Amino acid sequence: MTRSLAGAFAFATVMPVPSRRAAIAGRGVLTALPVVGLVLGSAAAAVCWLGTRAFGSGSVLAGALTVAVLLLATRGLHIDGLSDTTDALGCYGPAERALAVMRDGRAGPFGVAAVAVTVVIQSVAFSQAGWAAVLVAVAAGRVAVVVACRRGVPAAEGSTLGALVAGTQPLWVAAAWLVAIAGLATLAGERAWQGPLAVVVAVACSVVMVAHCVRRFGGITGDVLGAAVEVTTTVTALGLAIA
């Protein structure tokens, strides 16, 4: 379990973890990923709280700084996945053509637009919803990855990461993490039900997106998982920002 947790931090953050102490990406690392979300979320929540103290409650600067810290802490891994996935979904042709677009390192117009919209929405939503919402939204994004890698979900052809993690998570593990984060979310919204509902709706949106990617690409890839993180984080933050 310790190696899996270390592997999760090495995989999903900039934290320097000696390779001998970290497991490679696989079932255990994916199962531990929501723990990384809770730690990242706590750090981002602290930045949001400090930002509201410095710039005033509801300041977009606080939300923008929070998003910037998350991007730095994750090496932009997930937002890059969102960009590549959006470009691939926006192209014509068979799955092979779409996957080739996804693997191309250049960002196309769809990808750039998706990144811009996501950063703006997260910045505004975080500033409005507050630090507790940041913690829940970031953790929920990582739960979405566990759900996306549940049993029965295939990997896209040629995807190295997809082959390692697709279908590795028992349904009960995904459900347990979803219940845990939804329970935590009762403390984040204006109303007790608002947080859990935001988390469930956000993860459901991610499930729909991943299902579409499976139909389009033949399975999941690492980029699809990154997109799942960003979609879930954004929708959760939006739900918690509702007054």
UniProtKB/Swiss-Prot annotation:
One of its GO terms (biological process) is cobalamin biosynthetic process. One of its GO terms (cellular component) is plasma membrane. Its EC number is 2.7.8.26. The keyword Magnesium applies. It is found in: Cell membrane. Signal peptide: none annotated. It catalyses: alpha-ribazole + adenosylcob(III)inamide-GDP = adenosylcob(III)alamin + GMP + H(+); alpha-ribazole 5'-phosphate + adenosylcob(III)inamide-GDP = adenosylcob(III)alamin 5'-phosphate + GMP + H(+). Keywords: Cell membrane, Cobalamin biosynthesis, Magnesium, Membrane, Transferase, Transmembrane, Transmembrane helix. Pathway: Cofactor biosynthesis; adenosylcobalamin biosynthesis; adenosylcobalamin from cob(II)yrinate a,c-diamide: step 7/7. Its main location: membrane. It comes from the Bacteria. The chain crosses the membrane at residues 29-49, 54-74, 107-127, 129-149, 161-181, 192-212. GO terms for molecular function: adenosylcobinamide-GDP ribazoletransferase activity; cobalamin 5'-phosphate synthase activity. InterPro entries: CobS (IPR003805). Its cofactor is Mg(2+). It is a multi-pass membrane protein. NCBIfam families: PRK00235.2-1. Belongs to the CobS family. Joins adenosylcobinamide-GDP and alpha-ribazole to generate adenosylcobalamin (Ado-cobalamin). Also synthesizes adenosylcobalamin 5'-phosphate from adenosylcobinamide-GDP and alpha-ribazole 5'-phosphate. This is Adenosylcobinamide-GDP ribazoletransferase. It comes from Mycolicibacterium gilvum (strain PYR-GCK) (Mycobacterium gilvum (strain PYR-GCK)). The gene is cobS.
